[in-house]
Amino acid sequence: MDGSGQQTDTMMSDAGAEQPPPAPQPVAGMDNIPATLSYGGRFIQYNIFGNIFEVTAKYKPPILPIGKGAYGIVCSALNSETIENVAIKKIANAFDNKIDAKRTLREIKLLRHMDHENIVAIRDIIPPPQREAFNDVYIAYELMDTDLHQIIRSNQGLSEEHCQYFLYQILRGLKYIHSANVLHRDLKPSNLLLNANCDLKICDFGLARVTSETDFMTEYVVTRWYRPPELLLNSSDYTAAIDIWSVGCIFTELMDRKPLFPGRDHVHQLRLIMELIGTPSEAEMEFLNENAKRYIRQLPLYRRQSFTEKFPHVHPAAIDLVEKMLTFDPRRRITVEGALAHPYLNSLHDISDEPICMTPFSFDFEQHALTEEQMKELIYRESLAFNPEYQHM
């Protein structure tokens, strides 16, 4: 589970239908978690799966565990001040690993900068009870019901309209992200959150980067199955087109209910791509370095498959759009604006309701090697922006 709280097997209503989302369900046997007041009643402690979960007192019981990941645990809770249910992610020992701490800081700063219906919102950064003992980070996000990965895996029926509406919302959110001079770099079904009203929100910006940056191999980028050829071939021609490739893979998986390119490793991943879209021509390889070109030339020659024959149940206009997204050469791949204006999305596209970010996001805070203490201070300041009353506590 990524970024926000989700649960499985949520029933999806017709696209756009007004229907309140179901309340998140507690994990079996965890519906009566005792709460202990701490720090003079300013905080509440819960023991969840043997982990201490400590939040400000405005988050009233009951608190419900809704997910667990490598980073820690996610619970839903009610903010008694705003009367809103939120998903609170605890990142345990958040500063032990510098790369992970930087990811957390990046996600917080990016999501606070962005304001869009198709991007998950941060509702709170919960301040630590003691500034000098700041080890765990608690981030409250708007609560969603499930994610696209869970829907694809379930036996939930999806109409053509559902798939079309989900694709439109992904592209609408991505247009805003790219307009902020940001690449998401890790788009995949589990990073696309949904509620029962079919609203879709993009989450998990921990790997996001500025569009002009080329030093991209410093961290793990894009889950392999959704990774474009230029990344698999270590190209330095690194543009917003990487996200478009991922969207093409996601949309195909949504319609076919199985991953398009489930590669076991880099080599297998590239082979699966070539088997579908064919070996690129010399012109299509122009952007690659000589090593990458040499590597492709020594591979078997693959003929392009017919997308129409491979996906006979898919609307021809959808096939045309997918082919434009899954173009080998990133310079020729359709842009997010081009995809939104494609005939397949005619019934949904409305340029006056597809806002852009007016202020490009600045990654200046990453220009210097931050110490653990500096990262703590920056995240602490973010928490005070939500909780100014804790400034002098």
From Swiss-Prot:
EC id: 2.7.12.2
SUPFAM superfamilies per record: Protein kinase-like (PK-like)
Polar residues composition bias: residue spans: 1-11
Any GO BP annotation: defense response
Main enzyme class: transferase
Induction / repression: Induced by salicylic acid (SA), fungal cell wall elicitor and wounding.
GO molecular function, one term: protein serine kinase activity
S-S bonds: none
Active site: D186
Domain of life, source organism: Eukaryota
Reaction(s) the record says it catalyses: L-tyrosyl-[protein] + ATP = O-phospho-L-tyrosyl-[protein] + ADP + H(+); L-seryl-[protein] + ATP = O-phospho-L-seryl-[protein] + ADP + H(+); L-threonyl-[protein] + ATP = O-phospho-L-threonyl-[protein] + ADP + H(+)
Motif (TXY): 218-220
Record-listed ATP binding positions: I66, G67, K68, G69, A70, Y71, G72, I73, V74, K89
Domain Protein kinase residue range list: 60-345
GO cellular component: cytoplasm; nucleus
UniProt note on regulation of activity: Activated by threonine and tyrosine phosphorylation.
Cross-referenced PANTHER family: MITOGEN-ACTIVATED PROTEIN KINASE
Role played: Phosphorylates myelin basic protein (MBP) in vitro. May be involved in disease resistance.
UniProt subunit comment: Interacts with SIPKK.
Family classification: Belongs to the protein kinase superfamily. CMGC Ser/Thr protein kinase family. MAP kinase subfamily.
Name this protein carries in UniProt: Mitogen-activated protein kinase SIPK
Species, as recorded: Nicotiana tabacum
